[in-house]
């Protein structure tokens, strides 16, 4: 058993913090991608499809609008919008681009939870389907500007061990390091890129939604949001994946187990997380031409801390740390 006082006892393959990518922000990532693939599709909700250049244009207009209303770097904005719409993701990106952190609450959650979360997070504004309203918090008074790596990107509230919501803030540096780390792991022989379509099926109040978004936007792929009602139906989502030409999916094993094999024929990257993956599911879905990964990580560790590629034959493991992460087993001392 290793302890912080005895790092030499931790095998080298579990200590990958020296492999972390250089510090940058999520907005840096988005602009780099847009510069490489300006005419590639960035988001397609079935009604509206935007290229990366169009998405950037929309975001910059929103930043000017937010700045004119006194919102700037270091502020926090509550996001409570229905899933499945490009407008939800534009609101998140505009929040990041103005230098603020987004605080998501599922649109279907009770009003009491929204009030608790937004009050605890001290949000200065709340964006909903109806528009933007004033929040319970006060602005820091800083001007709108591009975020710095040390600035918070999001604050996501978990249930906490006591059942009381607990906010976990993640900086741009940590978030971008996570995005860049996954780029070093998945589909190295034929990387994600324009032409790939990434499912956005998770609630943005769940930190794994960040993986969905940035699997697309780090690589010039297209984010394809699914309405919450469709995701909750379970089985109906399978045929929808086919109709929307989805090629990359990050989901929970319980949901994937409901889909027929043909629903995933075009999916070349399938990522599991959020719960244990049954070995029989890995055996069924880890087929030639598709990478299947099992991931694990607490919210505090920035979405995912470790991952293992599944071959459908060996045991299901949580794997080794992402590049830039360390893993250790410690005792109470």
Where are these regions (language model features)?
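Motif- and composition-driven signal specific to adenylation
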Residues: 87-89, 100-114, 141-333
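Carrier-protein-dependent adenylate-forming modules in NRPS/ANL systems
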Residues: 1-176, 191, 220
């Amino acid at each position: 058993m290793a302890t912080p006082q005895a790092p030499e006892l931790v095998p080298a393959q579990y200590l990958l913090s020296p492999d972390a990518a250089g510090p940058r922000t999520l907005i840096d990532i988005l602009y780099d991608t847009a510069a490489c693939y300006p005419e590639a599709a960035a988001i397609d909700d079935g009604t509206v499809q935007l290229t990366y250049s169009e998405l950037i244009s929309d975001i910059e207009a929103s930043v000017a609008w937010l700045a004119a209303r006194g919102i700037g770097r270091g502020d926090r904005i509550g996001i409570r919008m229905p899933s499945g719409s490009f407008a939800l993701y534009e609101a998140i990106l505009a929040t990041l681009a103005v230098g603020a952190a987004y605080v998501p609450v599922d649109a279907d959650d009770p009003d009491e939870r929204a009030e608790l979360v937004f009050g605890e997070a001290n949000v200065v504004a709340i964006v909903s389907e109806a528009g933007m309203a004033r929040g319970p918090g006060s602005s820091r008074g800083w001007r709108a500007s591009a975020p710095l790596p040390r600035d918070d990107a999001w604050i996501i509230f978990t249930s906490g061990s006591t059942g009381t919501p607990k906010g976990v803030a993640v900086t741009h540096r940590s978030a971008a390091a996570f995005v860049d780390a996954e780029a070093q792991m998945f589909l190295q022989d034929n990387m994600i890129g324009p032409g790939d379509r990434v499912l956005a099926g998770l609630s943005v109040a769940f930190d794994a939604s960040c993986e969905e978004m940035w699997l697309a936007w780090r690589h010039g792929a297209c984010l394809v949001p699914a309405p919450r009602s469709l995701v909750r139906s379970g089985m109906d989502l399978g045929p929808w994946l086919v109709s929307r030409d989805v090629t990359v999916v990050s989901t929970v094993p319980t949901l994937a187990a409901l889909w027929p094999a043909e629903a995933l024929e075009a999916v070349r990257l399938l990522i599991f997380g959020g719960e244990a993956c049954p070995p029989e599911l890995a055996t069924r879905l880890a087929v030639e031409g598709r990478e299947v990964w099992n991931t694990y990580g607490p919210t505090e560790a920035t979405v995912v801390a470790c991952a293992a590629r599944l071959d459908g034959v060996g045991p299901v493991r949580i794997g080794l740390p992402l590049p830039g992460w360390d893993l250790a087993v410690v005792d109470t001392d």
